[in-house]
């Protein structure tokens, strides 16, 4: 995609310049009248300033349509909201491949500049920002422009399309065994207690706890406290055999919530021990717990480490402790796995919620 600003004495002259440089398939994105200075700034000559765009990738993919509406030609500029008259900085290149935001920001119409600013604040990857802006530009050309009111909605729609489909989100607790795993400090134990409390207090289910976190005494004591508050039994399992015995002990229960050890995600032994202790089967609903405060590269590494373990959904914790959900978006955009829950505080069971793809994107763009 190429975008270029042209200055000419008339629209007819501008159209000729556009055809000459970008070809007949170029589309006018915006136009306005300006005063062109001559003779050392003493004479202001009327002129027009036109922004045109050529989307070669789109043209290659486009298929002919028999009953299609005639496309807007270069003789008729795309209608768009009135943009204030201003001069453009001379350092901005006349023609720019759509890749570097800063290089062409000032030639975008106001609605698209608003979207660009919003994208910059999300923290998502640069390549995603660029592709999203390309799609917005393409839509603006086809739709005859975007307004301040509808540009954010279209932006959110484009971002939603990059995420796993809605049917992979908000999956309710339905299996007998609910297993949470992830790296240390992600908040697994507190999140497990929230899910268990909701299941018991709101769904009136009979619940029990199992923990395989035998590395930290504090973790066992923390879960024991929650179990006592909910008057639910707790079993500590060191081996696969003990886990099987606990399953038999809790055979009459509706849901059994399983806590696991939080270890350094760089340690491959942790994953092996997890699979040795817990037999992942159809009766188990498993969640990979990730902290929203983690860096994208670390989060990506964690997801890769756990790729050998069946993961039904993600749980993202600590969304109240970060100013940007860009890392979360980046992970989801690269994954086929949806989000089961998000947590936003330490209160049990209040600070946990389900979220849809659109709901998450709205959080991202707030």
UniProtKB/Swiss-Prot annotation:
Keywords: Bacterial flagellum biogenesis, Bacterial flagellum protein export, Cell membrane, GTP-binding, Membrane, Nucleotide-binding, Protein transport, Transport. Its main location: membrane. The keyword Magnesium does not apply. Residues 64-85 are annotated as: Disordered. GTP binds at residues 182-189, 259-263, 317-320. It is found in: Cell membrane. One of its GO terms (molecular function) is signal recognition particle binding. InterPro entries: FlhF, FlhF__GTPase_dom, FlhF_N, P-loop_NTPase, SRP54_GTPase_dom. It is a peripheral membrane protein. One of its GO terms (biological process) is SRP-dependent cotranslational protein targeting to membrane. Pfam families: FlhF_N (PF22510), SRP54 (PF00448). Necessary for flagellar biosynthesis. May be involved in translocation of the flagellum. Belongs to the GTP-binding SRP family. This is Flagellar biosynthesis protein FlhF.
């Amino acid at each position: 995609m190429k975008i270029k600003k042209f200055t000419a004495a008339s629209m007819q002259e501008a159209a000729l310049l556009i055809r000459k440089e970008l070809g007949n398939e170029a589309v006018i994105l915006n136009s306005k009248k300006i005063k062109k200075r001559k003779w050392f700034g003493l004479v202001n000559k009327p002129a027009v300033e036109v922004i045109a765009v050529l989307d070669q990738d789109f043209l290659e993919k486009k298929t002919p349509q028999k009953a299609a509406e005639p496309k807007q030609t270069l003789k008729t500029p795309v209608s768009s909201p009135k943009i204030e008259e201003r001069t453009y900085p001379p350092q901005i290149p006349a023609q720019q491949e759509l890749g570097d935001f800063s290089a062409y920001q000032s030639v975008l119409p106001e609605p698209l500049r608003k979207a660009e600013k919003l994208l910059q604040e999300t923290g998502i990857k640069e390549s995603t920002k660029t592709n999203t802006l390309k799609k917005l530009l393409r839509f603006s050309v086809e739709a005859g422009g975007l307004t301040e009111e509808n540009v954010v909605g279209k932006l959110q729609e484009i971002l939603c399309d990059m995420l796993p489909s809605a049917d992979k989100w908000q999956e309710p607790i339905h299996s007998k065994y609910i297993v949470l795993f992830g790296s240390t400090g992600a908040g697994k134990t507190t999140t497990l207690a929230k899910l268990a409390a909701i299941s018991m207090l709101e769904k009136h289910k009979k619940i029990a706890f199992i923990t395989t976190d035998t590395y930290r005494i504090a973790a066992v004591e923390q879960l024991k406290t929650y179990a006592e508050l909910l008057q639910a039994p707790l079993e500590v399992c060191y081996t696969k055999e003990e886990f099987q015995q606990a399953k038999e002990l809790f055979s009459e229960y509706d849901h059994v919530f399983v806590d696991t050890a939080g270890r350094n995600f760089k340690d491959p032994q942790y994953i092996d021990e997890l699979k040795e202790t817990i037999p992942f089967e159809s009766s188990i609903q498993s969640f990979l717990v990730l902290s929203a405060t983690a860096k994208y590269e670390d989060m990506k590494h964690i997801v890769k480490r756990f790729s050998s373990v069946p993961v039904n959904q993600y749980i993202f914790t600590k969304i109240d402790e970060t100013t940007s959900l860009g890392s979360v978006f980046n992970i989801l955009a690269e994954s086929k796995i949806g989000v089961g829950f998000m947590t936003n505080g330490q209160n049990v069971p209040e600070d946990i919620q389900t979220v849809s793809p659109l709901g998450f994107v709205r959080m991202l763009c707030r």
